[in-house]
Amino acid sequence: QWQGTEAVVLGCGGSARAVVAGLQQLPLTAIHVAGRRPDALDAFLKDLRADQCNDSVPLIAMSLDPERLSRVLKRSKLVVNTTPVGMQGHGDDKAMPLGRDLWTGVDSSVTLYDLIYTPRPTPWLELGQQHGCCTIDGLEMLVQQGAAALRRWSGREDVPVDQMREGALQSLGAHQP
């Protein structure tokens, strides 16, 4: 499904590093990384290029210029938001990464993955759903990170992932508007 396609990662922090490392395992033609601060973005990509295991997928720095973003988004099939924009309790809960206007024409063939897990769905994913996009929120990543940490800390392999997921859903449900 990802053969010959491009991906966009929004943000250049710690979670973006993990996302890019995962994306480098896919048969993508390019990974575009967008960040607000050019200095932070340059440092992020420099570190990644020094550390990366797979240099067959080009990493491309992308400014937040709306025209360039629009062109890149038109040819990308996966967009991952690693920023806190739109997260419940973090500024404007109705906010979307890069603003609503950029996403109003999103193609239904694009997969939108938001690492945020509350609210469910985020305003960005809700807009994507309205356009017929495949959308994924960050709950499963949260659960799997917790399971991996528990395995590592306890030495147990039989970690109750289903119970962890159910507990997370119950906890988030209690805090949903």
Regions found by a protein language model. Give the residues of each.
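Conserved S-adenosyl-L-methionine
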Residues: 25-30, 130-134
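NAD(P)-binding Rossmann-fold cofactor-contacting core
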Residues: 28-52
